[in-house]
Amino acid sequence: MENYPQFLLFFILASVVGIVSIAVALSWVLHYREGLGWDGGAAEFNWHPLLMVIGFIFLQGIAIVVYRLPWTWRCSKQMMKLIHAGLHILAFILAVISVVAVFVFHNAKNIPNMYSLHSWVGLAAVVLYPSQIVLGIAVYLIPVTPVRVRAALMPLHIYSGLFIFISVIAAALMGITEKLIFSLKSPAYKDSPPEAVLVNVLGLLIAAFGALVVWIATRSAWKRPREETAQTLSNNTTSPEEIKVGTDMTTTS
């Protein structure tokens, strides 16, 4: 891999920022909000931001870049496809649970649904995401699609995946801001109480994680090498810094 130390730095940063984001989201709902529950009350709503950060942001981000981890190149391409799809499916399951929690809470409290830009963008991402997963499995995981078709569709697959991921980041930033505006009364959001500061930090962490994932996913020098090259790596002890595969990258990794 070219610039392996740089890749490792960005991946470690992304992982740390993502994990810290989850910790901050958990701290927010446990310390400043009503905790977690499943009774139609505010504690049920709190699953929404927490599971969105864990699933729709962190797990989706890791799923996007998992192909590019050099230590996975010793695994078969089919195995990595299964891991890639599995992470996306798990992220989607958590996202669905979080959306259900919101609707149950809103209906229990007679709060209108689907009126804000946050809800529109967020639901659009939730609807598009399974379509991306199903098409990805049909085209790339099930070995029946011609290689030429897979190669032709790969740019669209990559673009739509990143578009959905960025849309989720945008929806999350709108959502946590909306929650603070509605919830903080005395002191108000504009007075910057500790909860507001904490959640603003969460927003910055989410944005930073998204930026790091997109950067890692769009560096052509960090793509997974061709299958035959990856198999060669599994049979030698060449360090990632010494592996030069810039000219051997496929367009379908």
Swiss-Prot record:
InterPro entries: CYB561/CYBRD1-like, Cyt_b561/ferric_Rdtase_TM. The lineage of its organism: Eukaryota, Metazoa, Chordata, Craniata, Vertebrata. Fe(3+) binds at residue 106. It catalyses: Fe(3+)(out) + L-ascorbate(in) = monodehydro-L-ascorbate radical(in) + Fe(2+)(out) + H(+); Cu(2+)(out) + L-ascorbate(in) = Cu(+)(out) + monodehydro-L-ascorbate radical(in) + H(+); monodehydro-L-ascorbate radical(out) + L-ascorbate(in) = monodehydro-L-ascorbate radical(in) + L-ascorbate(out). CDD domains: Cyt_b561_CYBRD1 (cd08765). Residues 230-240 have a biased composition (Polar residues). Signal peptide: none annotated. It comes from the Eukaryota. One of its GO terms (molecular function) is transmembrane ascorbate ferrireductase activity. It holds the Pfam family Cytochrom_B561. The keyword Iron applies. The gene is cybrd1. It comes from Danio rerio. GO terms for cellular component: apical plasma membrane; brush border membrane; lysosomal membrane; membrane. Heme b 2 binds at residues 68, 77, 84, 157, 223. Its main location: membrane. Heme b 1 binds at residues 48, 113-116, 118, 178. Its EC number is 7.2.1.3. Its cofactor is heme b. Binds 2 heme b groups non-covalently. It is a multi-pass membrane protein. Plasma membrane reductase that uses cytoplasmic ascorbate as an electron donor to reduce extracellular Fe(3+) into Fe(2+). It is also able to reduce extracellular monodehydro-L-ascorbate and may be involved in extracellular ascorbate regeneration. May also function as a cupric transmembrane reductase. The chain crosses the membrane at residues 6-30, 46-67, 77-103, 117-142, 150-177, 196-220. Homodimer. This is Plasma membrane ascorbate-dependent reductase CYBRD1.
